[in-house]
Regions:
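Non-cytosolic membrane-interface motifs at loop->transmembrane helix junctions
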Residues: 158-164, 219-232
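Juxtamembrane boundary at the C-terminal end of a transmembrane helix
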Residues: 271-283
Length: 283
C-alpha cells in the first residue's frame, strides 16, 4: 500500500513538473510573439513631435501592397498647420519629390504613389509648416526626421498561407522550448519532442515560409547560397541545429546537451526581429 502511494506521489510530481514546463514554454512563446509583433523593419514607426505648442502623434507605415496608393496621414486638429509629403526611391541619388497634404477632418492626408515592383522601397517623411504670429517667417518640423522612414512594397499573400505559416512557426518555437526544458527532468523524453520540433520547423519555415515570400516578393528563397536574407538564413540554421540534436540522440552519450544547445540557438534566432535584411529582391 505504501509502495503504491509512493508511486502515485512520484507520478503526481512528474505530471506537475511537466505542466509547469509547458506553462513556462507557453509564456516565453507569448512574449516572443509580442516582441516579433512590435519590432522589425516592416511594422509601423510610431512616435510624437511637439509643434506649435502641441503634441502630434504619428504612425508611419513601413509595409504596403503594390499596385495601390499607400495613404499617409497624421492627426493635427489644426487647420493652420500645413504639411508636405516628401519622398524618393530608397538607396538612390534621386532628387526628392514633394506634394502638399490635404486637411481633412483634423488630419493631414496624402498618398505615396503605387509601385508595381515587388520589394520596391521608398524613403519618405512629412514636413510640417506654420507661420509665426505677426511674422512672415515659417517654422518647420519633420516627421520623424529628414532621414525619413523606409517603406517596402509587397504582393498580397493569401490569408490562409499567412495564418498557417504563423501557426507552424510559433508552434515550432513552443515545441523547441519544451524539448530543451526536458533537460531539467529526471526522465526526459527528447525523441518524440525533437521529431515534432523538426516537423514543425520544416513545414512552417522551409515550406510555408518560402511560399509567403514568393507571394510577397516573387522569390521562394533568397538566403544562402543565393543571397543574404536573414529570415531564410536563420531558419535554415535553426533547422540544421535540430537535425544535429536528433543525430545526437542516437550517437551521443549525453544528447541532452545537444538538445539544450539547439533550444538556446532557437531562442537567439527568435530574438532577431522578423524581416531584417529580407525582401531585397526588386524586379
Amino acid at each position: 500500500m505504501e509502495e503504491q502511494t509512493g508511486t502515485e506521489t512520484n507520478l503526481g510530481k512528474k505530471k506537475r513538473s511537466n505542466i509547469f514546463l509547458w506553462i513556462v514554454a507557453v509564456l516565453i512563446t507569448i512574449i516572443s510573439i509580442f516582441y516579433q509583433n512590435t519590432t522589425g523593419p516592416t511594422y509601423p514607426q510610431k512616435g510624437h513631435v511637439v509643434f506649435n505648442g502641441k503634441q502630434i502623434d504619428y504612425k508611419l507605415d513601413r509595409s504596403a501592397l503594390i499596385n495601390q496608393d499607400c495613404p499617409v496621414k497624421i492627426y493635427i486638429n489644426d487647420s493652420t498647420i500645413k504639411g508636405s509629403l516628401i519622398w524618393k526611391r530608397f538607396n538612390t541619388r534621386d532628387n526628392e519629390s514633394s506634394k502638399p497634404m490635404r486637411y481633412e477632418n483634423g488630419y493631414l492626408v496624402s498618398e505615396l504613389d503605387k509601385q508595381d515592383k515587388m520589394a520596391a522601397k521608398l524613403q519618405y517623411y512629412i514636413q510640417l509648416s506654420s507661420s509665426q504670429p505677426g511674422s512672415q517667417n515659417e517654422i518647420h518640423e519633420y516627421i520623424p526626421d529628414k532621414s525619413g522612414v523606409v517603406i517596402r512594397f509587397r504582393g498580397d499573400v493569401p490569408f490562409m498561407v499567412i495564418i498557417f505559416h504563423i501557426l507552424f512557426i510559433f508552434s515550432f518555437e513552443l515545441l523547441s522550448l519544451k524539448t530543451g526544458m526536458e533537460f531539467f527532468r529526471k526522465e526526459p523524453k527528447y525523441k518524440a519532442y525533437t521529431f515534432w520540433t523538426i516537423g514543425l520547423a520544416a513545414v512552417g519555415g522551409l515550406i510555408l515560409g518560402p511560399l509567403v515570400q514568393y507571394y510577397a516578393f516573387g522569390e521562394f528563397w533568397t538566403g544562402f547560397p543565393f543571397g543574404f536574407d536573414l529570415t531564410d538564413n536563420k531558419m535554415i540554421i535553426a533547422f540544421a541545429a535540430w537535425i544535429v540534436a536528433l543525430i545526437a540522440l542516437y550517437k551521443s552519450k549525453k544528447p541532452g546537451y545537444w538538445v539544450l544547445g539547439a533550444t538556446i540557438l532557437t531562442i537567439v534566432i527568435f530574438l532577431i526581429p522578423h524581416s531584417v535584411l529580407s525582401g531585397n529582391v526588386p524586379k
